[in-house]
């Protein structure tokens, strides 16, 4: 993105404040364009009226991310990769979390193939208010047989996940594309030997393609430039992923060089980067647990350092959980704390005799408290106070959590302590103990100070509930 101020974007908008974009003013819409929560296509006059055509083209150019965004797949499960504008998250944020595709082989028994694909498609891990998922399937043409590969593609496509077709044989890739028309898979890969044929497939079927040159950035850039000049825009870079030793060091360095060059304005190499942690299984590690461990280490390294998409093998929980957790953490937007909606929540099946607790709406705090309560079978009312997504201790210190705000939260939730429960008592977090007196005055209720750590709530309840 070459502009970073709403005022700069505003110059290219109709400036009529028509409201068709859903915002009251064009300036408000310009702000959405800058923080990438809105798109130029959301402004009907800008799109439909010919007099704005030049402004639209220029605005799209200025708003385009430094690293091209590439879409793989179609529909709700399609994934975007790339699209970043900075080298370091604190300067803005990272967009489009690293996408994790897991491999299958086209020579697998059908039952085993279906079972593995279902394992990928059905993976769910609830984490801080959302389900973490695996992103897609990479189909490796181990057989090098076009017919067998096409059959595997048809079977995998039934899961509805985005796909990567892995073969250096253009005939195999073409068979896969015929079996998955209009599903927009990613082709892996074009190299110095097959670039012409694979490029023709990418143009004919309008699909994204990986260009590959192991540890040769000059060749990689040449391939990408050649494809761009041929009209292929959706390109992914594979500089090679070596699993150990100097090769791994070179891989790490190459990722840094590519991304730095792209962010600094070298458009010929400003594309998403593919990492291949599954090469850990080719490093001669006999023990599958150790191989899986090393694959996870590699995935972690390249999640942190600019891997936009990766192909992995191990589906063991000890491998997938750290991989998806790390990606979720690295791609959390530092500009906006992760939060839940403020309001009153039921934990279990609370009654008029159940305890009433409150915490802040910082997602990690809320879900930790909720989990500690529900996992111990405690039915209660849990109020999330809107503190702009800040945790209890910091919110108390910064004034985002006060007695007035707690009272407002109860009022907005329509929860009257005098009538909704029989005990007229509320439990405050231990880290908010200083609010006890003010809360009693504001709420007209009995306020008990709970434990400092929500993990101690069950023991605290045994000693202090019901109130005497």
Swiss-Prot record:
Q: In which pathway does it act?
A: One-carbon metabolism; methanogenesis from acetate
Q: Does the keyword Metal-binding apply?
A: yes
Question: Its Gene Ontology biological processes?
Answer: acetyl-CoA catabolic process; methanogenesis, from acetate; methylation
Record text on subunit structure and interactions: Heterodimer of delta and gamma chains. The ACDS complex is made up of alpha, epsilon, beta, gamma and delta chains with a probable stoichiometry of (alpha(2)epsilon(2))(4)-beta(8)-(gamma(1)delta(1))(8).
Name of the protein in its database record: Acetyl-CoA decarbonylase/synthase complex subunit gamma
**UniProt cross-references to PROSITE patterns, sorted A to Z:** 4FE4S
Q: Which GO terms describe its molecular function?
A: 4 iron, 4 sulfur cluster binding; iron ion binding; methyltransferase activity
Residue spans making up a coiled coil are: none
Traced from the root, the source organism's taxonomic lineage reads:
Archaea, Methanobacteriati, Methanobacteriota, Stenosarchaea group, Methanomicrobia
An example of a Pfam family matching this protein is CdhD
Domain (4Fe-4S): residue spans on this chain: 1-60
Cofactors demanded by this protein: corrinoid; [4Fe-4S] cluster
Cofactor comment text = Binds 1 [4Fe-4S] cluster.
Q: Which PANTHER family match?
A: ACETYL-COA DECARBONYLASE_SYNTHASE COMPLEX SUBUNIT GAMMA, PTHR36214
Q: Could you tell me the keywords of this UniProt record?
A: 4Fe-4S, Cobalt, Iron, Iron-sulfur, Metal-binding, Methanogenesis, Methyltransferase, Transferase
| Source organism (scientific name) | Methanosarcina acetivorans (strain ATCC 35395 / DSM 2834 / JCM 12185 / C2A)
